[in-house]
A protein has these predicted regions:
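Bacterial N-terminal signal peptides
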Residues: 2-8
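C2-type phospholipid-binding modules
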Residues: 97-153
Length: 295
C-alpha cells in the first residue's frame, strides 16, 4: 500500500519578529495588529480511525448466479480487492460436506507481493483444509450433524494433523484458487469448485491485512468466536465478513511538516493554479520527506 502522506504548513507570528519590524519602521502605525504580540503553538493531530485491517468483505453469490448460495462442482466465486506492497490475503470457505471444515490459507495469510512483483496465477498449493475444532467430525458427506457444542471441542488444526480416521480428497482434487492483477493495485481472486469435487463450497469471507496478523484464525488455538464457527459449520459467511469489515479501512499517517513566517502577499510554498516551484514540495507530498522544503 502506498501511504498518502500529508504535509502541514502553517504560519506563526512571534513577538520578536514584530518588535524588529516596529524598530526598523517597516510597519506603519496603522499596520500594527490589534492585541498583544506573542507566540503561538499549533498542534496537528491525526484523528482518523486506526483500523486493524485494510479491506474486507464477503462474496455470497456464485459466478453466473442471481442469488446467494453455495458453489457446486463446476462453479466458482470471484472476489476483487485492493492491496499494496506488504499486504497479505486471508479467506475462508466451508468444505460443505463436513461438520466444521473449511478451506483457506494459513492463519497469517498469503503475501500478495514479492518486493514490487504481485502474486498471480494458480495459488492452490498455498491453500489447506482446516478443522475449526468446534464440532466432532463425522465421515465426509455422511449427512450426520455434530452435536451442538457450547465450547470448541479442540484447537483449530490442519485436517492432516487431526487424524480423525476419515479420508478427504486433496485440496487440488476439489478446488482451484487463482489470483490475477490489473496493474493498479486491484487483484481478482477466483475460488473454483472443480468438476468431480466431493463437496460444495460456501460463500467466502476474506480480508486484506498486514504481515504479522492472523485475522481469521491461529493454528493450534481455539476459534476466536468472531464468526468462523458459523462459516465452518453452516456455510454462513455473513457474521465473519461483517466482523472483518468493521475492523477494515484506509489508514494514513500525517507526515512531518514544515512552517514558514512570511508576509501576507508572499506564497513561499505554493501558488494555487501554478506548477510546483521545484523546491521540495514534491518530495513532501509524495513520500513525506520535508527536508527539501525546509532547506
Amino acid at each position: 500500500m502506498t501511504l498518502a502522506l500529508f504535509g502541514i504548513i502553517f504560519t506563526q507570528c512571534s513577538k520578536e519578529m514584530l518588535r524588529d519590524d516596529l524598530d526598523t519602521g517597516s510597519l506603519k502605525h496603522a499596520d500594527v495588529p490589534k492585541g498583544v504580540p506573542g507566540s503561538f503553538e499549533v498542534t496537528i493531530e491525526n484523528v482518523s480511525t486506526n483500523y486493524a485491517y485494510f479491506e474486507a468483505g464477503g462474496q455470497f453469490i456464485p459466478d453466473g448466479k442471481d442469488a446467494a448460495g453455495p458453489a457446486f462442482p463446476g462453479e466458482s466465486f470471484t472476489i476483487q480487492f485492493h492491496a499494496g506492497r506488504g499486504h497479505r490475503l486471508s479467506f475462508a470457505t466451508m468444505y460443505g460436506a463436513s461438520n466444521d471444515l473449511f478451506y483457506g490459507p494459513s492463519g497469517d495469510g498469503i503475501a500478495l507481493f514479492d518486493g514490487d512483483t504481485p502474486l498471480t496465477g494458480d495459488i492452490t498449493g498455498m491453500i489447506s483444509l482446516w478443522d475449526a475444532g468446534t464440532e466432532v467430525n463425522h465421515a465426509p458427506a455422511s449427512g450426520e450433524d455434530g452435536a451442538e457444542e457450547s465450547e470448541p471441542v479442540q484447537s483449530l488444526r490442519n485436517v492432516d494433523d487431526v487424524m480423525d480416521g476419515f479420508t478427504y480428497n486433496s485440496v487440488e482434487e476439489n478446488v482451484m484458487v487463482t489470483l490475477a492483477y490489473d496493474g493498479t493495485r486491484m487483484f481478482t481472486l477466483t475460488v473454483k469448485d472443480l468438476e468431480g469435487s466431493s463437496t460444495p463450497l460456501s460463500p467466502v469471507a476474506w480480508v486484506v491485512h498486514n504481515d504479522g496478523q492472523n485475522p481469521i484464525f491461529t493454528e493450534g488455538s481455539v476459534d476466536y468466536g468472531d464468526g468462523l464457527e458459523d462459516l465452518a459449520e453452516t456455510g454462513n459467511a455473513g457474521p465473519l465478513s461483517t466482523y472483518l469489515e468493521m475492523l477494515s479501512g484506509y489508514v494514513s499517517p500525517v507526515a512531518p511538516g514544515v512552517w514558514v513566517l512570511h508576509k501576507k502577499w508572499q506564497k513561499p510554498i505554493f501558488t494555487e493554479g501554478e506548477l510546483d516551484y521545484g523546491e521540495g514540495l514534491e518530495m513532501l507530498s509524495e513520500v513525506g520527506d520535508p527536508t527539501g522544503v525546509y532547506n
